[in-house]
A protein has these predicted regions:
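Bacterial N-terminal signal peptides
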Residues: 6-16
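Short coil/turn linkers that connect adjacent helices within long alpha-helical scaffolds
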Residues: 58-61, 99-103, 137, 141-145, ...
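Terminal, low-structured helical/coil segments at or just beyond the last alpha-helical repeat
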Residues: 356-398
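N-terminal leader/linker segments that initiate helical-solenoid repeat arrays
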Residues: 17-47
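Conserved alpha-helical positions within TPR/SEL1-like repeat arrays
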Residues: 27-38, 64-79, 106-121, 148-163, ...
């Protein structure tokens, strides 16, 4: 903290020498923090914001720039998952906002919800409940009992109760939220689908699959109507519905749902994406449960092949990085692992690529004989691929 103070004071002194105000310095530091945050340099953004916060202390107690600085440093901490560091800033921000707007102003709700989330992440459920409950009370008084934002606050509390294993209270609050959303936004609104899924997830986590199933089915119908039957955002709902069907041993109903997820992912991300491997595993699991092992095996094999290809790419990239950093032993170990995978895959193109890269590393290490053996294998692979390639048709002469 002393470093941040010193940095800001130095900036102020420099600014004074240049005829600039403390306000201009604060704006410059905040801009530097914003750029660092947008570039993903969170530690630098944090450093700049600590400096800006020290500078903002010199403004009037209710100067909005102090609250703005607190909001930004909270955002940086949350992005990094540093919830414990965000907590005291939330309390201070809330105190400033209450002093400015009063204790029942709607503008307090985002800060209360953020504070509730910080407590919930630390499993401080009573403190989280207090923050969420206060946000709910403010919304009910300002907006009425039937406003969609009230439903959001009810859902926050329901999720908290679910995490605290207070399942009856959670179900009650989800039910209230669902009733509000259906009446205020219509029974086919996407927010209704979200609430249905949240309630279904509560039942699923308790093993109450029969109660979860109709909620997931209704949520799926709403989303299909809004997005069409092949949208990739349908997959979580399809998978959840398939899972509760599987949990009830309704395997013939789970199978087509997992098939749909597989087809959607193949179209959305390509047949060799790791996500497709997960979809294949899910479908294969249904066949195993039905003892249809001849159907499960090719799916598991395909999933394994996808993961091997993905691992091969990762090994190659990391090995190339190590080679560029002259960490040759580490690079060689990775190329050996990549080579073992490529040999197993029986994919000549991938095998040739790994052999060539490994040979290049061996040349760098002045191990020419070993490199030559690998290069000879690469030539053999290329020759076989060329022989298998169909001859090009000659273009007719005009």
């Amino acid at each position: 903290m002393r470093t941040a103070v010193a940095a800001f004071l130095l900036a102020v002194l420099s600014a004074v020498a240049l005829g600039q105000s403390q306000s201009v310095v604060w704006e410059g530091v905040m801009e530097a923090a914003r750029k660092a945050y947008e570039q993903g340099r969170y530690e630098e953004a944090e450093k700049q914001l600590k400096s800006a916060l020290q500078g903002a202390e010199g403004f009037e107690p209710r100067d909005p720039r102090l609250a703005t600085t607190l909001e930004q440093i909270i955002t940086v901490y949350r992005t990094q998952g540093k919830m414990a560091l965000a907590e005291p800033h939330y309390h201070r921000l809330l105190g400033i906002q209450e002093g400015t707007w009063g204790p029942l102003d709607l503008r307090l709700v985002p800060t209360l919800n953020g504070l509730g989330m910080v407590y919930a992440s630390a499993r401080q459920y009573e403190e989280a409940e207090s923050a969420y409950q206060r946000a709910l009370t403010i919304r009910e008084k300002a907006l009425g009992d039937a406003h969609p934002d009230v439903a959001t606050s009810l859902e926050n509390l329901a999720g908290l109760y679910g995490s605290a294993a207070k399942f009856e209270q959670a179900a009650l609050f989800y039910g209230r939220a669902l009733d509000i959303r259906e009446k205020s936004q219509g029974p086919e609104h996407l927010n209704v689908a979200t609430t249905l899924e949240s309630m279904a997830g509560l039942y699923r986590d308790q093993g109450k699959y029969a109660l979860a199933e109709p909620l997931y089915r209704r949520a799926l119908a709403i989303r299909e109507k809004a997005w069409g039957p092949e949208h990739s955002d349908l997959v979580p709902t399809l998978d959840s519905l398939a899972w509760v069907c599987y949990g009830q041993r309704k395997f013939p109903e789970a199978e087509p749902l997992y098939w749909r997820s597989l087809v959607i992912w193949e179209k959305a991300v390509g047949a060799d994406h790791p996500t497709v491997a997960t979809a294949l595993d899910n479908l294969a699991g249904v066949y195993v449960a039905e003892e249809l092992f001849d159907k499960a095996e090719p799916l598991y094999r395909r999933a394994l092949s996808i993961r091997e290809k993905s691992a091969l790419v990762s090994f190659d990239k990391l090995a190339s990085l190590y080679a560029g950093e002259k960490k040759y032993p580490e690079a060689e170990q990775l190329y050996k692992q990549a080579l073992a995978i490529a040999e197993k895959m029986n994919e000549p193109v991938e095998l040739g690529m790994v052999l060539q890269k490994y040979a290049e590393l061996l040349r760098l290490l002045e191990r020419g004989e070993e490199a030559a053996r690998l290069e000879a294998r690469v030539k053999d692979i290329h020759a076989k691929l060329a022989a298998e390639r169909p001859p090009e048709k000659k273009k007719p002469k005009h």
